[in-house]
Regions:
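Phosphate-binding/switch loop-helix module in NTP-utilizing enzymes
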Residues: 103-183
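P-loop NTPase motor core
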Residues: 75, 90-112
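A short, basic N-terminal segment
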Residues: 1-36
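AAA+/P-loop NTPase substrate/partner-engagement loops
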Residues: 72-84, 101-102
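Catalytic-core regions built around general acid/base machinery
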Residues: 57-61, 177-188
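Short amphipathic alpha-helices and their capping/turn segments at secondary-structure boundaries
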Residues: 81-82, 87-91, 144-153
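Glycine-rich P-loop/Walker A and Walker A-like loops and their local beta1-loop-alpha1 context
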Residues: 24-76
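Loop/turn-to-beta-strand initiation segments
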Residues: 66, 153-157, 187-190
Length: 190
């Protein structure tokens, strides 16, 4: 049986029954916003502005410490630049999985390619002799993101931009399971 969360009546009054999309015209069309406890999955075309919409969805963060924006394709500096441009809050939590992946996985692959093409230099051999030759760096970004969002408390707001990163690297059934877990967490913590 799922745990039951008791909501403070003052919180219910403050947060209301719906959360803003961050786009007033869209909020009006959607009768005030998205109902609390709902999860949204948007399927968009490349170049349709989904990254901007994802950021804008975090902008009406009622509690910045309970708001999380996870980007899989943009860097920290680009995200900050956009938030500053539109005067959105900068005190929300941001995680840039794409940057993390590039620095941990792709840099090693690039180095391995260089070794294959150019061979080893004496400095490379000395450096490698001081480290383990086989790195055990299997990072499970999907589980990390799931746990990070599930740690958020009531009335949280989280955006994952985008699921493509996970679908390209994981079994799709694991990604769907993550979305279902997040849906249950959202319903519980509305």
């Amino acid at each position: 049986m799922a745990r039951k969360i008791e909501f403070d009546p003052e919180d219910e009054e403050f947060f209301g029954k719906v959360g803003s999309f961050g786009v007033p015209k869209f909020d009006n069309e959607m009768h005030g916003g998205v109902p609390r406890g709902f999860i949204m999955v948007a399927f968009t075309d490349t170049g349709s502005g989904s990254e901007l919409f994802a950021k804008q969805f975090t902008s009406p963060a009622e509690e910045s410490d309970n708001t999380l924006y996870i980007s899989t394709n943009e860097g920290q500096q680009e995200i900050i630049r956009i938030f500053q441009k539109y005067d959105w809050p900068l005190d929300i939590s941001v995680r840039t999985i794409g940057e993390e992946y590039n620095s941990t996985v792709l840099e090693r692959e690039l180095l391995a390619s260089r070794y294959r093409l150019e061979g080893f230099r004496l400095d490379d051999i000395r450096r490698l002799a001081q480290t383990r030759f086989v790195e055990d760096n299997t990072q499970d970004y999907l589980t990390e993101v799931t746990n990070e969002i599930m740690a958020l408390g009531p009335y949280f707001r989280a955006v994952v931009d985008s699921l493509d990163f996970f679908l390209q690297r994981e079994d799709p059934s694991r990604v769907v399971a993550m979305v279902r877990m997040l849906q249950a967490h959202a319903q519980l913590n509305r």
